[in-house]
Swiss-Prot record:
Pfam families: YbeY. This is Endoribonuclease YbeY. It comes from the Bacteria. It is found in: Cytoplasm. The gene is ybeY. Zn(2+) binds at residues 118, 122, 128. It comes from Rhodococcus jostii (strain RHA1). The lineage of its organism: Bacteria, Bacillati, Actinomycetota, Actinomycetes, Mycobacteriales. The keyword DNA damage does not apply.
């Protein structure tokens, strides 16, 4: 899976976290493991230009998705197994997202993770134009984000336990411990 991030926003953002959450969602949604995704972080002026050009709406927005192919959620059961493909581009505006995060009372990193999940779901054919679509997409978005955070917590616990076990085994003489 190839995920490219280009930060042109002028803001310091954890590209590793964006890649992590995008990779998690793509895997969880059973997208081909060789799929490609591009993410671009832009400033408010650039996002406002894109928003006007593609949506005919004034001002910046938080996230826009540009799929390479029109996909539908779930696909068809009788269709052949899809091969690797370019999913498309996600454009994020960290400065706009920062304002949203402040209003929501959570960190910018959380807002960007949420918007990344949202953008990937749009690339996979999900939409929220109708109430039922919104309910489905936002429910899935929140579940995926919650699952990603749980996955991160589990990985941190596992790493802490592995470090503790290595230290104990080193003290017991099973192998050289870093603190000996």
């Amino acid at each position: 899976m190839s995920i490219e991030v280009s930060n042109e926003s002028g803001m310091d953002v954890s590209e590793e976290e964006l890649i992590s959450v995008a990779r998690f969602v793509i895997a969880r949604m059973d997208v081909h493991p060789a799929a490609e995704l591009s993410m671009v972080l832009v400033d408010s002026a650039t996002m406002a230009d894109l928003h006007m050009r593609w949506m005919d709406l004034p001002g910046p927005t938080d996230v826009m998705s540009f799929p390479m192919d029109e996909l539908e959620p779930g696909g068809r059961p009788d269709s052949p197994e899809p091969g690797p493909s370019m999913l498309g581009d996600i454009v994020l505006c960290p400065s706009f997202a920062s304002d949203q995060a402040d209003k929501a009372g959570h960190p910018l990193a959380h807002e960007l993770a949420l918007l990344t999940v949202h953008g990937v779901l749009h690339l996979l054919g999900y939409d929220h134009a109708e109430p039922e679509e919104e309910k489905e997409m936002f429910g899935l978005q929140n579940q995926l984000l919650e699952d990603w955070y749980e996955d991160l917590r589990r990985a941190e616990r596992d790493a802490a336990l592995a470090a503790r076990d290595q230290k104990l085994l080193g003290k017991a003489g099973f192998f050289d411990s870093p603190d000996q």
